[in-house]
Amino acid sequence: MLIEPKMIGSSEGQALLESLLNRFQIGDSGCQSAVEDILTAVRQEGDAAVVKYCRRFDCPDMTASALAVTAAEIAAAYELVDAAFLETLAAAIERIHSFHEREMEDSWMQTREDGTIVGRLVRPVDSAGLYVPGGTGGSTPLVSSVLMNGIPAGIAGVTTRVMVTPPGKDGKISPHLLVAATEIGITEIYKAGSAWGIAALAYGTATIPRVDVIVGPGNQFVTEAKRLVSGMVRIDMIAGPSEVLIVADETADPVYIAADMLAQAEHDPQALSILLTTDRQVAEAVPAEIERQLKTLSRAEIAEKSIVDRAVILVVADIEEAIGLANDIAIEHLELMIVDPWAQVPHIRHAGAIFLGSHTPEAAGDYFAGPNHVLPTMGTARFASALGVETFLKKSSIISYSQTALQNDAEHIQRLANLEGLTAHANSVAVRVK
């Protein structure tokens, strides 16, 4: 048996729960020094450094003049994708766009009785960079990453949207990625992967423009690079391994549960798959079903390692306990396979995305339902949210006083300024109300 169910009240169950509650980790991933060197090289050498690293790790024949994807390459990409893909792409774009356009925020103003005007001005950032992983050398293009990161930026009104992605050894990028980017209005695409791609977006080179926001998933080098440049640019988040928590009662189908745990496990050997169930029979049926389905998967080796090392099945007393534990764990993806999932929604406080009912696999949210699939991991759902339109917006406060309004507030402003020992602040009011 790849995974053995535990009772939540047992010592083993409590130990597993403790590890889940303390899974947040930020430390040296083992590549910090190497990434720092890459960032320094790109900052100082620009395109030359990007080309150097690209030649070393991706395309041996890369040149600076070939970093930017050309119109001819885009046109060729359209010849290489089929009509079925274009149909699915259009449908996914419509779903994702329809959801995210509801997130757009408006500027607002408030005029008080004394004539003071205060408000908030909402504006998009000028530029955003999307990092899209190569996807097993381009053989498994991550089209969903293009859509989930690029569409919200477009809705926000970002003028300059650029994409970087590693080329294959032949210097080419997956036609599916090129078409997806083009269909959502991204016209600047560059062949730059890993930490040097992030560095180029953060610092700018002669070819690749510097941006204000960097979003997109990647390996430990990409994640470390984003962490190191955050502060000088906004990043979406520091993402850990992907994770799912399934709450199931006696009505849940072990086949569905196993399928969804494996869907998570095939991402990464470090992916986390958790089942909290009120039913012992369900808990005992799932491991056998996992083993049966595992044999059919293309990424069986990765999924099996993830299940063996990282999967957890805990039997709990009731749904209330399961929801309480789910809130404590603050999972990225929360699935409710129970009789009345909607009844529990008011009790859920911490989850990146919530999937209600047995016919709502996480995969629907990953690709097509509409909500964003870039979600907080490692327990950060306690305070963080999914990537969205807001990721690409910034807000400025508006304040306008009339002479009468300032006269009315002057005493209060000066009193607080003097209390803090900032007499120049107080004086800046006093000289206006003499």
Swiss-Prot record:
It comes from the Bacteria. The keyword NAD applies. Substrate binds at residues 242, 264, 267, 333, 366, 420, 425. The active site is at residues 332-333. It is an enzyme of class 1 (oxidoreductase). Keywords: Amino-acid biosynthesis, Histidine biosynthesis, Metal-binding, NAD, Oxidoreductase, Zinc. Pathway: Amino-acid biosynthesis; L-histidine biosynthesis; L-histidine from 5-phospho-alpha-D-ribose 1-diphosphate: step 9/9. GO terms for cellular component: cytosol. InterPro entries: Ald_DH/histidinol_DH, Histidinol_DH_CS, Histidinol_DH_monofunct, Hstdl_DH. It catalyses: L-histidinol + 2 NAD(+) + H2O = L-histidine + 2 NADH + 3 H(+). Binds 1 zinc ion per subunit. Its cofactor is Zn(2+). Pfam families: Histidinol_dh (PF00815). One of its GO terms (biological process) is L-histidine biosynthetic process. Zn(2+) binds at residues 264, 267, 366, 425. GO terms for molecular function: histidinol dehydrogenase activity; NAD binding; zinc ion binding. Its EC number is 1.1.1.23. Coiled coil: none annotated. Catalyzes the sequential NAD-dependent oxidations of L-histidinol to L-histidinaldehyde and then to L-histidine. Belongs to the histidinol dehydrogenase family. This is Histidinol dehydrogenase. It comes from Desulfotalea psychrophila (strain LSv54 / DSM 12343).
